[in-house]
């Protein structure tokens, strides 16, 4: 079965092949065009006949109708509205299909009323004029006057001007934000001949702390006059209404109380009952008199201990000086003995070392005729054996020796403990004698 298609085909017909098939004829489609609802807008459809090449009593016919619709152009009037100017001069090198509208900003924006777009074409160069010189324009300034914000100083509550500084919680003016430089008064030094410089502090500054001893003395001297001073001030105990006390205190509320009421509340944590108030003279402790006539046993014992410490320190100093003197004396004696022993002239040792004239025969050589000790010589002595190759003459040997006149004796300091103990014992013996 063959199908033939073409553009804008509204009808088609199928024909049987040339050979009959069972003697049946297929129904054909109605070739008449469909009814149109709007007869005024559609033209009469043209008809075209297509002959088939098959030689068959049943012909195949196709009707092709053009699908063109004829509409009458309508022109409508556009309602007038406002348009702003558009600069088309920059669009000359752009593609019309990809061109985007460009809206430049102007300081003075013209306002114009446009009617219908008569004579408007598709070309970008044939734009209608959007500016009319006869219509007034509205000038909009490019800049607006701005008002500087005002701030209030968080410290002095005044308006902050130029030079203000941002701080935590607000702004601070230049006067409050500028650090104040404080200068301490100079310290005066008085220098006098023969005396060390004394530091003088001006009266504006607080004076230095007083020594502990002077503070104790002043407190002990003023303790007796506390009662009279407190009575002169007119203080009254808020608990017992008493005025005679040696020391004024304050309770938890800050009210003045006497010494008895203050101590009672401190120990028992309850106010002192008024029934415990005693009239008459106050009981005070027995203290040392200022004259010093009456001395307690403790004071005498302290004086004795002080004297003993002084005497013992004196004795220790004396013993140490004696020890140093004895040590120096022992060093001098040791040095003198060492020098004397080193520089003393040798004496005859004939009785100590008897020399025999008998020959001593050895396997390798024979020694005989040893020189005797020279008792008259003032130089050092030496025994020289009788050498078979060279004989030392007695005269040459004696004249060739010189006395030892450059002997230097170095006395080393005592280092070991035993020697030190012996030196101390020697000093003790010298001191006793």
Swiss-Prot record:
GO terms for cellular component: nucleus. Residues 1-47, 194-235, 275-332 are annotated as: Disordered. It is found in: Nucleus. GO terms for molecular function: DNA-binding transcription factor activity; DNA-binding transcription factor activity, RNA polymerase II-specific; double-stranded DNA binding; enzyme inhibitor activity; RNA polymerase II cis-regulatory region sequence-specific DNA binding; RNA polymerase II transcription regulatory region sequence-specific DNA binding; zinc ion binding. Disruption phenotype: Animals do not survive for long beyond hatching and frequently die at the L1 larval stage. Upon attempts to feed, food accumulates behind the pharynx and there is blockage of the brush border that surrounds the gut lumen in surviving L1 stage larvae. RNAi-mediated knockdown results in a reduced body size and reduced gene expression from zinc-activated promoters and of genes related to the immune response. This reduction in target gene expression is enhanced when infected with B.pseudomallei. A zinc finger (GATA-type) spans 237-261. This is Transcription factor elt-2. It comes from Caenorhabditis elegans. The lineage of its organism: Eukaryota, Metazoa, Ecdysozoa, Nematoda, Chromadorea.
């Amino acid at each position: 079965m063959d199908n033939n298609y073409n553009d804008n085909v509204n009808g088609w017909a199928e024909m049987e092949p040339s050979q009959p098939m069972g003697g049946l004829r297929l129904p054909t489609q109605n070739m008449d065009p469909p009814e149109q609802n709007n007869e005024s807008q559609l033209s009469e459809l043209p008809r075209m006949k297509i002959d088939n090449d098959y030689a068959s009593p049943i012909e195949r016919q196709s009707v092709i109708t053009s699908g063109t619709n004829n509409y009458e152009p309508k022109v409508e009037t556009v309602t007038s509205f406002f348009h702003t100017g558009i600069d088309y001069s920059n669009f000359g090198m752009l593609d019309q299909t990809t061109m985007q509208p460009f809206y430049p900003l102007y300081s003075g924006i013209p306002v114009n009323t446009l009617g219908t777009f008569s004579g408007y074409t598709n070309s970008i160069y044939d734009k209608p004029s959007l500016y009319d010189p006869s219509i007034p324009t509205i000038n909009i300034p490019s800049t607006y006057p701005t008002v500087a914000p005002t701030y209030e100083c968080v410290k002095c509550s005044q308006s902050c001007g130029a030079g203000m500084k941002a701080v935590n919680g607000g702004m601070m003016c230049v006067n409050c934000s500028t650090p104040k430089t404080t200068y301490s008064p100079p310290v005066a030094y008085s220098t006098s001949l023969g005396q060390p410089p004394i530091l003088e502090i001006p009266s504006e500054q607080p004076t230095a702390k007083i020594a502990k001893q002077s503070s104790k003395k002043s407190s002990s001297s003023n303790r007796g006059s506390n009662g009279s001073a407190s009575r002169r001030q007119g203080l009254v105990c808020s608990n017992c209404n008493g005025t005679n006390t040696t020391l004024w205190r304050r309770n938890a509320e800050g009210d003045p109380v006497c010494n008895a009421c203050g101590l009672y509340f401190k120990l028992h944590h309850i106010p002192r009952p008024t029934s415990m108030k005693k009239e008459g003279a106050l009981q005070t402790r027995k203290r040392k008199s200022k004259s010093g006539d009456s001395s307690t046993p403790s004071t005498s014992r302290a004086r004795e201990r002080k004297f003993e410490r002084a005497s013992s320190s004196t004795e220790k100093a004396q013993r140490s000086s004696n020890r140093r003197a004895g040590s120096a004396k022992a060093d001098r004696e040791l040095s003198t003995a060492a020098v004397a022993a080193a520089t003393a002239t040798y004496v005859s040792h004939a009785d100590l070392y008897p020399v025999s004239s008998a020959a001593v025969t050895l396997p390798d050589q024979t020694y005989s005729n040893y020189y005797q000790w020279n008792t008259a010589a003032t130089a050092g002595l030496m025994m020289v054996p009788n050498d078979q190759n060279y004989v030392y003459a007695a005269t040459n040997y004696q004249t060739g020796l010189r006395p030892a006149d450059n002997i230097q004796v170095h006395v080393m300091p005592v280092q070991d403990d035993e020697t030190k103990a012996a030196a101390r014992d020697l000093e003790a013996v010298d001191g006793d004698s």
